[in-house]
Each structure stands twice: as C-alpha cells, then as structure tokens.
Amino acid sequence: MSVFSNILDENSRNLRNEIPCDDGIASPINDDDEEFLTKSNRVLLVGADSNSSLKNLMTQYSYQVTKYESGEEAMAFLMKNKHEIDLVIWDFHMPDINGLDALNIIGKQMDLPVVIMSHEYKKETVMESIKYGACDFLVKPVSKEVIAVLWRHVYRKRMSKSGLDKPGESGTVESDPDEYDDLEQDNLYESNEEGSKNTCDHKEEKSPTKKPRMQWTPELHHKFEVAVEKMGSLEKAFPKTILKYMQEELNVQGLTRNNVASHLQKYRQSSKKTCTPQEPQEDFVWGNAGPDVTLAASKTLLSSHATPSYLINNQAAPRGSYFMNNIPYPSTSCLPVNNNNCFMTNPSTYIDQFQHQLQQQQQHQQYQSTLNSISAMLTKQESRHVPSSAMENSEPLMIYNSNLPFGIDECFPPAGFNIFDQIGHN
C-alpha cells in the first residue's frame, strides 16, 4: 500500500469527474518512450526481512530485482554499480543504515530515485522521509497494484533529466496562473522523487528560469469565443476541439490544451453567473414604499388653501400670535420643541376642534352685537308706554330673531364658559 499512490489515484478520479474527457487524447510517444516500455527496470531492494515474497511479486511485473538484507552491503554494492540501478527501495527500520541515512548518502553521491517502505504509517515517519528526498512511501504489505506502477518514478526521473516537465507543452508557451502554481507543485514533487537531493541541495540547485504566465489578450479571448461559437454551444465545446480550431482556422500558435482547458473552465463559470437571474428582494425597503397617506392628508389640511395661516405651526411664534395673519409660517406638520428640534404630529383632530371653537366664538360675538342693538331699540320705543316702576320690577325681555344662523338653544353658552380657557387647554 502506498500513501502517494492513493493520493494520485484519488486525484485522478476527481479529475475524471470534474473535467469532460475527450476521446483520443494521449501523450505523444517518441522512440525513447517505446524503448522504455520494452526495457526492464533494475531495482535494488534492501530489507531486513528474509521473506522474498516482495521480490517474487516484483519479478512478476518484469522488474530485475537485486535484494540485500544488510544495509552496509547494499550501500557498497550501490557505490560500485550505481549506473546499473534504476530504482532503490529501502526499509526505513534497517538496523545498520536506516532509511534516512540511506537517503542522505544517495542524495549526495548519486542521482537515483529512492522509495522508502515501512510497516508503520505515522505522519512523522512519512514527513521525515519526504524531507530527506524520498519519492514515495510504501506501507507493508505492499499490494500488487502499487508494485505494478513503481516504474513511474524511473520514467519521471528520465523526463527530468531530458528537461521535459510535462509532455506536450512547449517551453515558449506562457502558462496560466493556476497552471503555474501546479507546475511549482510538480517540480517540488519531482525533486523529492529523484531521491538525489536533500533540503540544502534543493535551495542551491533551483532552476534559474521559470515559465512566464499566460496572458489572455482581448484579441486572443475574442478568437476563443469565436471557436466556442463554432462548436455550437458551450456544453459541446471541449479543449481539444477548441485548440484544434484556433490553431488551424484562426492561426493561433503557442497555446496548449491545458491553457484552453483552464480558460474554458473560467469562461463557463462566468457564463453561469451572467445567466443567473436576479431574485427580487422580498425585504421591505423604505425607498420602495408608496406615499404616506397620513402625511399627505396632513399636508392637505395644513396647506394655505384649506387652513388659516394662524393655525400653521411656527418655530418661533408666541402664544398670542395665533391670531396674527401677517406672520409667514412654514408649510410643515412639525411642532418646535427643545431648541427647534421638530417632531411629527397629527394635526387633523386638533385643527377640527380649534376651528369649531373659533366658530362658536364668532357666532357668540355676532349674537351679542345683534342682541345689544335690538335691546337698545326696544328700550327707546317702549320706555314711553311702560312705567319706570314696572320696568324695574319686571324680568329681562328675551327676544329671538329667526333670521340668525343658529338656534335658540345655542344662543348662550353654559355658565362659567370661557372660550380662551378652552383654547389654552387644547
């Protein structure tokens, strides 16, 4: 069982689920690759276990295995025949030379990929092995599926020596930002897999050149959109077909399938966001509210056409200025209190009561004026026929004029009634 192998298998499954797979896509195979496919890989197996089951299993998968149960003997053999070994598998718990010591020696003096194996899978053990340059970590018992693909470390080592970071990518092509980050991860992983450099060696032997980032110019993006439209729809567009159309029909050079795949994924996400309809906001917003019916009615009541000017609130009007018609009043329904800080009021009820009381006051004054004039006239006319003694002892004469705009019951207010006291209370 291999920790790295499980991670690689899981990542492969995730990629197959997320990215549409194009049939017929394969890495280019050159003559060197064909030679590697037919060639057997030479493996040095170092372990204290005398059981040869692992060796027999590796032999079934066409590995040429040389096995040692002593670390010192294995290291001596490796010093003399380092050019005849393609892969080293070393037990982490060897008594004389453990796995970390072997990684240190091989990393300084040789250029071989080293795989560490152990019966335990503690994180500390795995992390230490990786830090010292192990390209893989196997947990005993090792399955046949893991053994079957151990040759990938030898193949990756050959690619790193020939300067091929990834098949199918040109050194002059700019990489996407996401691809650039992935490339850094791959380079770090490959340097660990080489098993030939420790931590200090990695810092000293960094590659002086890095691939520049991919720049999708507006013109290049327009050609990309033309290619997508040519496919019929965004769902039918695949990186391989888009790249082929851009290279053959639009004469675009320097692009790779990974560049197009990354840009296509971002383009799909952007299209989904653009096509998603905006849901109406259900939350109440004051800006969307309709007109305030109460406030509109209050403004109507307080307008100069419907209400006398002395009934409109003034910020600095004294108590006695209610009857002053020449003072300009603001057309608002706010009362001034506490240093002219206004608050809203509902003046409808107050104005109705106040107008009714003023009407009563005017009617009473009109009645008093009419009554006084009539009484004066009767007194002058009837004083000639009525003796003075009779007038002194008789009750006051009450005369009602039917032409007045009020009834006889409304002539006199109740005893003790004062219109100005009523206005002050209200």
UniProtKB/Swiss-Prot annotation:
Modified positions (4-aspartylphosphate) in chain numbering: D91
Expression sites by tissue: Predominantly expressed in mature pistil tip. Also detected in the shoot apical meristem as well as vascular tissue and hydathodes of the leaves.
Subunit structure of this chain's protein: Binds the target DNA as a monomer.
Protein name (Swiss-Prot/TrEMBL): Putative two-component response regulator ARR20
Coiled-coil parts of chain: none
GO cellular component, one term: nucleus
SUPFAM superfamilies, alphabetized: CheY-like (SSF52172), Homeodomain-like (SSF46689)
Domain of life: Eukaryota
Response regulatory domain span: 40-155
Basic and acidic residues: bias regions: 194-208
Function noted in UniProt: Putative transcriptional activator that binds specifically to the DNA sequence 5'-[AG]GATT-3'. Functions as a response regulator involved in His-to-Asp phosphorelay signal transduction system. Phosphorylation of the Asp residue in the receiver domain activates the ability of the protein to promote the transcription of target genes. Could directly activate some type-A response regulators in response to cytokinins.
Disulfide bridge map: none
One GO molecular-function entry: phosphorelay response regulator activity
Alphabetical list of CDD domains matching this protein: REC_typeB_ARR-like
Protein's UniProt keywords contain DNA-binding: yes
Residue ranges of the annotated DNA-binding region, renumbered to this chain: 213-268
Entries under InterPro entries matching the protein: ARR-like (IPR045279), CheY-like_superfamily (IPR011006), Homeodomain-like_sf (IPR009057), Myb_dom (IPR017930), Myb_dom_plants (IPR006447), Response_reg_B-typ_pln (IPR017053), SANT/Myb (IPR001005), Sig_transdc_resp-reg_receiver (IPR001789)
Family from the record: Belongs to the ARR family. Type-B subfamily.
The species this protein was found in: Arabidopsis thaliana
GO biological process terms held by the UniProt record: cytokinin-activated signaling pathway; embryo development ending in seed dormancy; regulation of DNA-templated transcription
